[in-house]
Amino acid sequence: MNTIEISNELIQFIESSPSMFHSIKTIRTYLDEAGFTYLPESKAWDVKAGGKYYTIRNHSSLIAFKVGNDMDSYHFQMCASHSDSPTYKVKNVPELAGPNEYLRLDVEAYGGMIDNTWLDRPLTVAGRVLVRNGSKIESKLLYIDKDILIIPNVAIHFNREVNNGYKYNRQIDLCPMFSCGALKKGAFDKMVADELGVKAEDILGKDLFLVNRQKGLVWGLENEFVSSPKLDDLQCAFVSLKAFIEAENEKSVNVYCCFDNEEVGSNTKQGAMSTFLKDVLHRINAGLGKTEDEYYQAIAKTFLVSCDNAHALHPNHAEKTDAVNFVTMNGGIVIKESANQKYTTDAFSRALFTGVCQNVNVPVQSFANRSDVVGGSTLGNLSNTQVSVHAVDFGLAQLAMHSCFETAGVKDTEYAIVALKEFYETNVQIEEAESVCLEK
């Protein structure tokens, strides 16, 4: 498969994942087709050497694992990404009537997006809806496959400051227009009910989010770029999933994690700071008939690749990045490092993962923020509060992070799959952070 084919598959993966709930459904489809067995958290687990399994939490986070056949002295090799992206959530009472005959939606920010990128483009909604069905309450996925909303800008004639650093007020400026007389109040819930084939009065709860309807594409004179909504972080979710499914390792339990709520801090029951990963690893250990002490031995030898995209050198603002620790699109995978531990990378984990990449000739780039810029954190250092393991922060270089339409390099998607597959297939033997053997 060449870079264009991989990029087009990535675009399809993202288009089938308009919300975090749909992201997990898409990932489950890949796993089901690859022969994985679903293990509900609420049921007893039957875990065997050589088996392939996955479990989900809240239908928005997923952990999958492949058990090797030689589990005498085992450990975990893990990749973690996230299923969510910055957007706007529709409030429970969704409609704002007026002025005049306008009908608008009442929304609030989910995460730290670039607000103005959401204006003047066709939008829709996606997520989950909880519906009464007799004595049961059932969860249903919703995606309105139609252009139904726009957040209109104010004409420059009425807002002369729009090009002079105008600050958008999310309560006033960012309410999507739903109708101008054709629909009456109550139309939104009726639309949702009609789409699901239920009665509006049977809808008891909604987690619905705005979706950018713009299609992803490969572009450039030499087809060197891929642009799409949600590259952060579905590009990493995609590449780590492809590598995980393709790889085999007889002496490791390979683990794939895709957590929800990274964009709002991860401090939820299904986020990276939850007990989800710890719970799953303990249950794997128990299923293999191992003791508690053997579990802690395995954790001491475990390695995590925290997968979240990185900021590429900007063509118009090179001054925003460090003078030498900057990265470029199509330049290879990125290892991110931060002295204040916003990223998990240290010398040991950098050396280990660089060695893995060198084994398959994947170029490695180094990213650090400018010393006068406070960068964001991601999954690895947060999940380590629950499961403390050696970890590296990995990503792919992209532009316009947290825009509703982001840009990355086509080569890097392939680089990442190759590197992460090599990681999963390598028996990473860690000895107390003093040495590591990378054997296959």
Please describe what each predicted stretch is.
Residues 1-440:
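N-terminal hydrophobic/helix-forming segments and targeting peptides
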